[in-house]
Amino acid sequence: MANLFIRKMVNPLLYLSRHTVKPRALSTFLFGSIRGAAPVAVEPGAAVRSLLSPGLLPHLLPALGFKNKTVLKKRCKDCYLVKRRGRWYVYCKTHPRHKQRQM
């Protein structure tokens, strides 16, 4: 969801960067100082995409998987057991990190 939102916000900027000349201040900000003579990116939108690289974006939706356990335990009062596809699972609505799967 956040990835889609960011793409919707950045795509117009990428489109504009192909057809207009960037102001000197913005190009200096994106490509470093002019004295450093940093090579300009070949692709028109590469500078904007480099600002949105995965290392710079906050991790908004961490993907937490199941902990594989031989013996399942309810870790709080809201944990509950479910049997699906021949395995037992522990789910918790208040603490999603309590999710467990029987090995």
From Swiss-Prot:
Keyword Ribosomal protein attached: yes
Protein name (Swiss-Prot/TrEMBL): Large ribosomal subunit protein bL36m
Domain of life: Eukaryota
Compartments where located: Mitochondrion
Subunit composition and interactions: Component of the mitochondrial large ribosomal subunit (mt-LSU). Mature mammalian 55S mitochondrial ribosomes consist of a small (28S) and a large (39S) subunit. The 28S small subunit contains a 12S ribosomal RNA (12S mt-rRNA) and 30 different proteins. The 39S large subunit contains a 16S rRNA (16S mt-rRNA), a copy of mitochondrial valine transfer RNA (mt-tRNA(Val)), which plays an integral structural role, and 52 different proteins. bL36m has a zinc binding site.
Coiled-coil region: none
Pfam families in the record: Ribosomal_L36 (PF00444)
GO molecular function annotation: structural constituent of ribosome
Main location: mitochondrion
PANTHER family the UniProt entry points to: 39S RIBOSOMAL PROTEIN L36, MITOCHONDRIAL, LARGE RIBOSOMAL SUBUNIT PROTEIN BL36M
GO cellular component, as recorded: mitochondrial inner membrane; mitochondrial large ribosomal subunit; mitochondrion; nuclear body
Keywords (A to Z) from UniProt: Mitochondrion, Ribonucleoprotein, Ribosomal protein, Transit peptide
Family indicated by similarity: Belongs to the bacterial ribosomal protein bL36 family.
GO biological process, one term: mitochondrial translation
